[in-house]
């Protein structure tokens, strides 16, 4: 039995675009999670050539699919080495004693030298680190990385990859690179009638067939087009069917998007700590996204229960009422959060 899985990645919480220079390593533009005016101009000047077909585009041939939960034991933590090297090095340092670390980078020698150099905590032992050369657009691998699914509940591990909801073609194929490197089949929701656009920051699984999302998943799969793509066209029922067919999700909890949250990822304000516990941001009364968050959680409590048939436990944590603060996102590598 295989009881570990490949983490879909880690999100580093920086929302500004900047030039990063640390010691002798200088990195280029670091794009924010949402595509801004400057990045769009770069994309349009270079042209966009997405890889439309990739992975296995038919449903996994298993009858007991289970999408892994983030807190389960992991085999490896995946990192996109694209900006913020000092922080990424600290993440590697904290993780290498807990699990294997797989780093995607456009310059393996530079990344290796930085990890073994004296800056930001000193030299690291790379025995438990795999460095893979890979073209990248951004750091946000939590959003575009692969999802671990078991075909036979705890055996027959596969990776499931969606259409990424950003015009970043290099990022969108990282899951295929990971699958090839590890020898794991990658099933992709890239072909009709199973085409589905989604992002890791807007998906949480309890490991027992229940998933949480904002209604962004409906908005981005209801047809139409924008400046860079034509969206898949499905009803909410069809969307839920694709999640069940590829990932074994049989209870799909969606919540209205928030009025002030620009990217509408649920991990901006909540975290599923285990199969029965929610960590949720709490704003001052009547402030910002607080009322909608409270309404969403109340709806969850009124209409859904845990795997065990009990009410979800909710832990509220104080959130800043304005831009510039943090939110309860994290990545996990075994006991390290």
Where are these regions (language model features)?
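Bacterial N-terminal signal peptides that target proteins for export
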Residues: 1-10
């Amino acid at each position: 039995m295989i009881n570990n899985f490949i983490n879909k990645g880690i999100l580093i919480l920086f929302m500004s675009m900047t030039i990063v220079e640390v010691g002798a390593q200088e990195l280029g533009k670091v794009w924010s999670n949402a595509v801004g005016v400057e990045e769009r101009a770069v994309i349009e000047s270079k042209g966009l050539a997405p890889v439309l077909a990739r992975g296995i585009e038919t449903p996994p041939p298993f009858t007991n699919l289970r999408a892994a939960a983030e807190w389960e034991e992991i085999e490896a933590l995946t990192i996109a080495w694209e900006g913020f090297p000092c922080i990424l090095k600290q993440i590697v340092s904290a993780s290498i004693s807990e699990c294997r670390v797989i780093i995607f980078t456009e310059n393996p020698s530079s990344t290796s030298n930085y990890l073994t150099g004296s800056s930001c905590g000193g030299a690291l032992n790379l025995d438990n680190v795999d460095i893979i050369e890979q073209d990248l657009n951004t750091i946000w691998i939590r959003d575009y990385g692969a999802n671990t699914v078991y075909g036979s509940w705890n055996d027959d591990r596969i990776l499931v990859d969606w259409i990424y909801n950003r015009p970043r073609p290099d990022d969108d194929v990282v899951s295929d690179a990971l699958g090839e490197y590890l020898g794991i089949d990658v099933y992709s929701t890239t072909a009709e009638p199973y085409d589905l656009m989604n992002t890791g920051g807007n998906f949480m699984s309890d490991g027992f067939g229940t998933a949480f999302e904002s209604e962004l998943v409906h908005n981005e799969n209801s047809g139409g087009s924008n400046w860079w793509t034509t969206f898949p066209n499905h009803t909410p029922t069809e969307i839920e069917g694709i999640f069940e067919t590829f990932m074994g999700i049989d209870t799909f909890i969606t919540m209205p998007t928030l009025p002030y949250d620009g990217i509408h990822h649920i991990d901006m304000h909540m975290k599923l700590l285990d199969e029965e516990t929610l960590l949720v941001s709490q704003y001052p009364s009547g402030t910002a996204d607080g009322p909608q968050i409270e309404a969403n959680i109340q709806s969850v409590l009124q209409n859904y229960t845990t795997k065990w048939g009990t009410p979800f436990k909710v832990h509220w944590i104080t959130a800043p009422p304005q831009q510039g603060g943090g939110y309860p996102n994290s990545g996990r590598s075994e006991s390290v959060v």
